[in-house]
């Protein structure tokens, strides 16, 4: 079983590290190729490309300019500890044990516009480049064209030595980088719904946090068979047999 999640826009390169263990991204050469093209952008072009403020455009243009290899613990940080956002609040990797990190390295991957596919402990330098960004590059009109089949092929390789179940806990924007028709695995997509105004509905903030919580549940309980995820019960969620089918698993939570 392999779980995939999205990255986050917010980054933390200041907090104490929960582990010194680190690895290198598998697609660093591809990231270098992208960075070389991104370095050609002026700050105002970065702002326009990403629909962000002038201040953020300046910050991210500077990040592109200072980005360099090799990655070391002095100039980079492990991805799962660098990303901050609702998913990562639920995941709470800062509290992981060494054994938790080791399990996560085998069963969790982070999709990324710049790095393609990251292992939790892969070092990365700060960046902002969402997968849906329409950045024309040497390989095509956007980042989906840039990554092509690479991410899917990497996932297939990882799944070949496993029970061939991919648990999709990523956003639609990021999951679009996976070519479903070429995926050699069963795909399971958990959905999280909260009771509000007389019905169960997906509330973005809660659903994102729940994706991280499910990863945490799988990691801390050493879950390797996807069906065991149906026991997920953190923060009051429970599996709904009635609302689920083979590939879409619905977890409900009653009013908080």
From Swiss-Prot:
One GO CC annotation: cytosol
GO biological process: response to hydroperoxide
InterPro entries per the UniProt record, alphabetical: YaaA
Disulfide-bonded cysteines: none
Stated family: Belongs to the UPF0246 family.
Protein name (Swiss-Prot/TrEMBL): UPF0246 protein Maqu_2499
Source organism of the structure: Marinobacter nauticus (strain ATCC 700491 / DSM 11845 / VT8) (Marinobacter aquaeolei)
């Amino acid at each position: 079983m392999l779980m995939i999640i999205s990255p986050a826009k917010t980054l933390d390169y200041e907090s104490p590290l929960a582990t010194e263990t680190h690895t290198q991204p598998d697609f660093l050469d591809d990231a270098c190729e992208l960075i070389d093209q991104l370095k050609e952008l002026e700050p105002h072009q970065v702002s326009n490309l990403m629909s962000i403020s002038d201040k953020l455009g300046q910050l991210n243009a500077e990040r592109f300019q200072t980005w360099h290899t090799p990655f070391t613990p002095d100039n980079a940080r492990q991805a799962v500890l660098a990303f901050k956002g609702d998913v990562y609040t639920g995941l709470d990797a800062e509290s992981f044990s060494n054994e938790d990190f080791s399990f996560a390295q085998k069963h969790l991957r982070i999709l990324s516009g710049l790095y393609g596919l990251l292992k939790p402990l892969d070092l990365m330098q700060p960046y902002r480049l969402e997968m849906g960004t329409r950045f024309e590059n040497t390989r095509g009109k956007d980042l989906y064209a840039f990554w092509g089949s690479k991410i899917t092929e990497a996932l297939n390789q990882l799944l070949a030595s496993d029970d061939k179940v991919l648990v999709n806990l990523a956003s639609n924007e990021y999951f679009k980088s996976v070519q479903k028709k070429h995926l050699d695995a069963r795909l399971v997509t958990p959905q999280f719904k909260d009771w509000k105004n007389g019905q169960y509905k997906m509330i973005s903030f809660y659903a994102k946090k729940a994706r991280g919580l499910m990863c945490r549940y799988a990691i801390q309980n050493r879950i390797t068979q996807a069906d065991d995820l149906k026991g997920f019960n953190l923060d009051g969620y429970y599996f709904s047999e009635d609302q689920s089918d083979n590939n879409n698993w619905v977890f409900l939570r009653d009013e908080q």
